[in-house]
């Protein structure tokens, strides 16, 4: 699931010019590069959180729970949930990061996460929780699902930027 979200995200930003990566559709909207930077920054924090909660689970090991992970979604049928979500300041893009740099950082982080699979599968991750600023308390299973959901949410935002009438390269006069 995370791999699929990463592939969809990477496909949505591939082949863009620097002008397209840095196009801002409105003063209060992020560029494609800023969306990519945000994803890499958030996933860096989520990897640290995963390590922290995994260490807690391994300190008091219980076999994996036989339970369905409660649904958690930031999208409904591919549409963004209503309302604008504001990113905490710590994960707000600072700029100066290209899409390629953000994608490389994100792929490295996800590779580190994938290397934890055996350890994650060996313990019950439903006991360790952490509070999300907008979604409330989530267990580690839900946090892991959120990685892909979050990338998909920003992929949809990127597609919205690309569909803007002012997006560079869409008009024959710009070719």
Label the predicted regions.
Residues 8, 12, 112, 116, ...:
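Solvent-exposed, charged/polar functional surfaces in cytosolic regulatory/catalytic domains
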Residues 2, 32, 102-106, 144-147:
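Hydrophobic packing residues in well-ordered alpha-helices of helical domains and bundles
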Residues 4, 41-45, 97, 101-108, ...:
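Generic recognition of short, well-ordered alpha-helical interface segments
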């Amino acid at each position: 699931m995370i791999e699929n979200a990463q592939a969809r995200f990477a496909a949505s930003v591939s082949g863009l010019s620097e002008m397209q990566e840095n196009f801002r559709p409105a003063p209060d909207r992020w560029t494609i590069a800023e969306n990519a930077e945000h994803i890499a920054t958030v996933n860096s924090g989520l990897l640290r959180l995963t390590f922290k909660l995994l260490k807690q689970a391994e300190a008091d090991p219980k076999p994996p729970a036989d339970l369905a992970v409660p649904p958690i979604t930031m999208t409904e049928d591919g549409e963004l949930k209503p309302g604008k979500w504001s990113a905490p300041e710590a994960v707000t893009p600072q700029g100066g990061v290209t899409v390629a740099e953000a994608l490389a950082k994100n792929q490295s982080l996800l590779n580190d996460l994938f290397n934890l699979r055996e350890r994650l599968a060996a313990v019950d991750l439903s006991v360790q929780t952490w509070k999300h600023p907008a979604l409330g308390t989530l267990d580690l299973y839900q946090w892991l699902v959120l990685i892909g959901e979050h990338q998909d949410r920003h992929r949809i935002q990127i597609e919205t930027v690309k569909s803007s009438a002012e997006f560079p390269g869409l008009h024959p006069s710009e070719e």
